[in-house]
């Protein structure tokens, strides 16, 4: 049976390690720290098969060169971003296969960075810094419109998709979400569960897309309550869903 595990790294990053059904090989997603990956491979007696990168930020690529050199494995990453270690550049809409793991689907997710991509594999969405549990990434290189479109693209995936994001930001994300959407009972329950998990030293990820659609404000920009909250915050009418998104993102950036 295939599986994907989040490895805590750096300040609040997650490196995702996925193993094949035979339990002999694994691939790494966004390895910001090679030592964390090496320790996990040693503990589980697994061989590294590939590295997948979602975007160029150093906390997601810091360990790639060391892993690629030591293990001589392919490195997949966004074709439109400059990541020197990527030797298999890919873009959204492409599919590729890895022996023992089957097929991967690549999705374009511009917004956080201009060339950000995500990977869909066996019901797992490796979303990097595009979609978080309870939130989304800051808009650094793209536009709010691009980011909103990217998230809507991800929101159309099957509801049982496991969202494997790049950071442990869930409690802060859900605290903001609860501020913007205080009458959402499911959101309040999820926030408490996330607090309990962190207090116990447990990760809050992966989530499911169904959870995100019910509680993540950045996927719910057509919700009347969130529209009103965003309008109250900015002091003007918001006619389009992407305007609601942009306002929520600016609001979150100030908290």
Curated annotation (Swiss-Prot):
Gene Ontology molecular function terms on file: hydroxyacylglutathione hydrolase activity; metal ion binding
List of residues binding Zn(2+) 1: 55, 57, 112, 129
Cofactor entry: Zn(2+)
Record's catalysed reaction(s): an S-(2-hydroxyacyl)glutathione + H2O = a 2-hydroxy carboxylate + glutathione + H(+)
Family matches, as InterPro entries: Clx_II_MBL (IPR035680), Glyoxalase_II_hydrolase (IPR050110), HAGH_C (IPR032282), Hydroxyacylglutathione_Hdrlase (IPR017782), Metallo-B-lactamas (IPR001279), RibonucZ/Hydroxyglut_hydro (IPR036866)
Top EC class for this record: hydrolase
EC number of the protein: 3.1.2.6
CDD domains membership: hydroxyacylglutathione_hydrolase_MBL-fold
Binding of Zn(2+) 2, residues: 59-60, 129, 167
Cofactor descriptive note: Binds 2 Zn(2+) ions per subunit.
Pathway note: Secondary metabolite metabolism; methylglyoxal degradation; (R)-lactate from methylglyoxal: step 2/2
Keywords: Hydrolase, Metal-binding, Zinc
Assembly information from the UniProt record: Monomer.
Family statement drawn from the similarity comment of this UniProt entry: Belongs to the metallo-beta-lactamase superfamily. Glyoxalase II family.
Primary role: Thiolesterase that catalyzes the hydrolysis of S-D-lactoyl-glutathione to form glutathione and D-lactic acid.
HAMAP family cross-referenced by the UniProt entry: Glyoxalase_2
Name this protein carries in UniProt: Hydroxyacylglutathione hydrolase
Lineage of origin: Bacteria, Pseudomonadati, Pseudomonadota, Gammaproteobacteria, Chromatiales
């Amino acid at each position: 049976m295939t599986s994907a595990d989040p490895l805590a790294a750096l300040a609040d990053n997650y490196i995702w390690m996925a193993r094949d059904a035979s339990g002999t090989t694994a691939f790494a997603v966004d390895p910001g720290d090679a030592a964390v990956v090496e320790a996990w491979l040693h503990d589980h007696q697994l061989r590294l098969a590939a590295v997948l990168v979602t975007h160029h930020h150093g906390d997601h690529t810091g360990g790639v060169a060391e892993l690629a050199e030591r293990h001589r494995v392919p490195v997949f990453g966004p074709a439109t971003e400059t990541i020197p270690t990527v030797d298999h550049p890919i873009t959204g809409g492409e599919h590729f296969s890895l022996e023992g793991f089957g097929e991967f689907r690549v999705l374009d997710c511009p917004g956080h960075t201009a060339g950000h991509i995500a990977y869909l594999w066996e019901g797992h969405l490796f979303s990097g810094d595009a979609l978080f549990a309870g939130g989304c990434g800051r808009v650094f290189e793209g536009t709010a419109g691009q980011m909103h479109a990217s998230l809507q693209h991800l929101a159309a995936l099957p509801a049982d998709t496991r969202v494997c994001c790049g950071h442990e930001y869930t409690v802060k994300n859900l605290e903001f979400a609860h501020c913007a959407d205080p009458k959402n009972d499911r959101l309040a329950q999820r926030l408490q569960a996330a607090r309990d998990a962190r207090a116990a030293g447990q990760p809050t990820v992966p989530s499911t897309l169904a959870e995100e659609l019910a509680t993540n404000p950045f996927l719910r920009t057509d919700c009347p309550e969130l529209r009103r909250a965003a309008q109250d915050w900015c002091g003007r009418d918001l006619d389009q869903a992407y305007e609601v998104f942009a306002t929520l993102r600016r609001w979150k950036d100030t908290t």
